[in-house]
Amino acid sequence: MRPAGRSANQVRPVTLTRNYTKHAEGSVLVEFGDTKVLCTASIEEGVPRFLKGQGQGWITAEYGMLPRATHTRNAREAAKGKQGGRTMEIQRLIARALRAAVDLKTLGEFTITLDCDVIQADGGTRTASISGACVALADALNKLVANGKLKTNPMKGMVAAVSVGIVNGEALCDLEYVEDSAAETDMNVVMTEDGRIIEVQGTAEGEPFSHEELLTLLALARGGIESIVATQKAALEN
């Protein structure tokens, strides 16, 4: 029995609260069970130097956790004077995932920064960040079109992510912290709304996993992502 009584293929309750803050062009509070992340999308005119003159835009991301997002307080990375390796890995993942959702040529010379700040962590913070940031990005792009700065919306479709893993020999979807910490295999999967894979991060923490188990985990992830995408689309219609 899973901690919340979920079935093996069931994601936690997902809530996406749009327009959560007033200044950013897109803002979403995303909740995957007890994991809560504030995602904002900020638009700036211009692109990084390596893209100047190429007529395309750029999407980048930053990720962080509030000091008491976890069971015990973690010092702010700003106080330490540098970002940790985990933080850099996650924010690069978020940026790669969301660039797959957008036609950068159609975006033109705009940069959109996605800031994902974890308020409360209970497993799956990077996958929640991607899923919430995609909705914030959609709102920001809609504003560019509504304001006449873009003629065509460059959004190609939704992108979402979910964690999957093997816990006590059973393949599970959307691991919460107690499951994640006990997992023999832990995997994060990012997909487009039509089920194409953007990224798979998978590690055998204990016993190596088989090819058949990998396919089972990917199938679980696809089902979970389909559910998350349906929630994203419903949120954008409200």
Curated annotation (Swiss-Prot):
Binding site for phosphate: 86, 124-126
Disulphide bridges: none
CDD domains for this protein: RNase_PH_bact (cd11362)
EC number: 2.7.7.56
Gene Ontology molecular function terms on file: 3'-5'-RNA exonuclease activity; tRNA binding; tRNA nucleotidyltransferase activity
Cleaved signal peptide residues: none
An annotated GO BP: rRNA catabolic process
UniProtKB keywords: Nucleotidyltransferase, RNA-binding, rRNA processing, Transferase, tRNA processing, tRNA-binding
Catalytic activity: tRNA(n+1) + phosphate = tRNA(n) + a ribonucleoside 5'-diphosphate
InterPro entries noted in UniProt: ExoRNase_PH_dom1, ExoRNase_PH_dom2, ExoRNase_PH_dom2_sf, PNPase/RNase_PH_dom_sf, Ribosomal_Su5_D2-typ_SF, RNase_PH, RNase_PH_bac-type, RNase_PH_CS
Subunit structure: Homohexameric ring arranged as a trimer of dimers.
Family indicated by similarity: Belongs to the RNase PH family.
Function: Phosphorolytic 3'-5' exoribonuclease that plays an important role in tRNA 3'-end maturation. Removes nucleotide residues following the 3'-CCA terminus of tRNAs; can also add nucleotides to the ends of RNA molecules by using nucleoside diphosphates as substrates, but this may not be physiologically important. Probably plays a role in initiation of 16S rRNA degradation (leading to ribosome degradation) during starvation.
Protein name as annotated: Ribonuclease PH
Source organism of this protein record: Citrobacter koseri (strain ATCC BAA-895 / CDC 4225-83 / SGSC4696)
